[in-house]
Regions:
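Glycine-rich phosphate-binding loop and adjacent beta-alpha segment
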Residues: 246-321, 354-360
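A short acidic, Gly/Pro-enriched loop at the edge of an enzyme's catalytic core
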Residues: 235-242
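C-terminal hydrophobic helical "lid"/dimerization subdomain
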Residues: 2-4, 19-30, 303-360
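Short glycine-centered segments of the SAM/dcSAM-binding site in methyltransferase folds
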Residues: 123, 180, 263-264
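A structural motif shared across PLP-dependent enzymes of the aminotransferase-like
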Residues: 128-140
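Glycine-rich beta-strand-centered segment in the early N-terminal region that forms part
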Residues: 52-69, 83-130
Length: 360
């Protein structure tokens, strides 16, 4: 929105004997461009708008967005499905925040009174609120300095997918050097990080993906790659110490069949059409069964925190982790980007890029 503030009065003109009022350009509040919606639904509910910049709290920062990542969580928040998403604070009947998007990379514009780690001008990456916009609000504890070797587009691809992979393997999978790890969904956003992080921890990694993505998974370090269109991982003789299931929908019995007797299964994904559970029924069954078997079966919710963002940053700067970007889209193309991801085309991450010199 363009808002004209009260004009400032100029000195009287001596040449005409009349007073002149002039408007100064700096008194125009430009606002920002954003992709917003008023209702839950498909990508058709999204539209480009001129809106006010977000206001920040004492522990927050205003970030000028250079790039924003797209992940499955974006689709869930956009659609309001499964329904528990709405109960988690996103709005019961209509979305509370019209702008979606979480992954962000950009430059700090302003900081709140309690912010100590960052100052205006710092390049950062992490997790914000409403990042499909020219400016986004973010908590200090959910950002980290952008790795110098990454572009803004690469940095925007890291946070949510990288944290999910890191915590799934390290905290819930307890991965150790020499273990055999199976990553199901190895070519996706989380999967491409998981393969590299498991290798960084010294594991022997097998990735599961489709035919067209085999070369990609092999190129990022997988020791073995299973093309699920030609081979069923559950029918082989190999047993795994840890399975990270990101994109699959295999039954618990099939997954347990290829686990060692004391192995660990971590479910971090898998979608169904259910409007209430949306695939989480499998996670729930795993949690209920785990106490009664020798194997550890479970799931988790990613923790968005500064400390683990620094771990990812260190892995990147050590050359052990590189974001895999499939395609980039402009801010105006956010609906197309979400459709592309939803249809399963992505090899790695999908990223939204913003050019601030071009007002879209």
């Amino acid at each position: 929105v363009f808002t004209r503030r009260k004009s400032k009065e100029a000195e009287p003109s001596t040449s005409t004997g009349t007073q002149i009022r002039r408007f100064e350009l700096e008194d125009l509040d430009v606002g920002m461009k954003a992709i917003a919606r008023d209702a839950y639904g498909s990508p058709t509910v999204l539209e480009r708008r001129d809106i006010d910049k977000p206001e920040i709290g004492d522990a927050e920062m205003l970030v000028r967005v250079h790039a924003a990542g797209v992940d499955r969580g974006v689709w869930h928040v956009m659609a309001g499905l499964p329904y528990p998403i709405r109960l988690a604070g996103y709005g019961l009947r209509a979305p509370k925040n019209p702008v979606i998007g979480s992954d962000v990379a950009g430059v700090v514009e302003t900081v709140g009174n309690d912010v100590t780690r960052f100052q205006p001008g710092d390049e950062v990456f992490g997790i914000g609120k409403g990042t499909f916009a020219e400016y986004a609000c973010a908590l200090e504890d959910k950002l980290a300095p952008k790795p110098t070797k990454l572009t803004f587009e690469q940095a925007a691809a890291v946070s949510i997918s990288g944290l999910t992979a890191l915590q799934g393997l390290r905290d819930h999978g307890r991965v150790k050097p020499g273990q055999k790890v199976l990553v199901i969904g190895a070519s996706g956003g989380v999967g491409t990080f998981a393969v590299q992080i498991a290798k960084a921890f010294g594991a022997q990694v097998t990735g599961v993906c489709s035919t067209t993505k085999v070369d990609l998974v092999r190129s990022i370090g997988a020791d073995h790659v299973i093309d699920y269109t030609r081979e069923d991982f559950a029918e082989g003789e190999q047993r795994y110490d840890l399975i990270l299931d990101i994109g699959g929908n295999s039954s618990l019995s099939r997954l347990r069949h290829v686990l060692t007797s004391k192995g660990t299964l971590v479910i971090a994904g898998g979608e169904t059409e259910g409007r209430w559970l949306g695939g989480t029924d499998r996670q729930i069954r795993a949690l209920l069964l785990s106490p009664f078997v020798g194997q550890k079966l479970g799931t988790f919710v990613c923790s968005e925190n500064h400390e683990d963002m620094i771990v990812l940053k260190d892995l990147i700067e050590a050359g052990k982790l590189t974001p895999v970007i499939d395609r980039t889209f402009s801010l105006s193309e956010v609906p197309e980007a979400i459709r592309y991801l939803e249809e399963g085309h992505a090899r790695g991450k999908v990223v939204i890029t913003l050019e601030h010199n071009d007002r879209i």
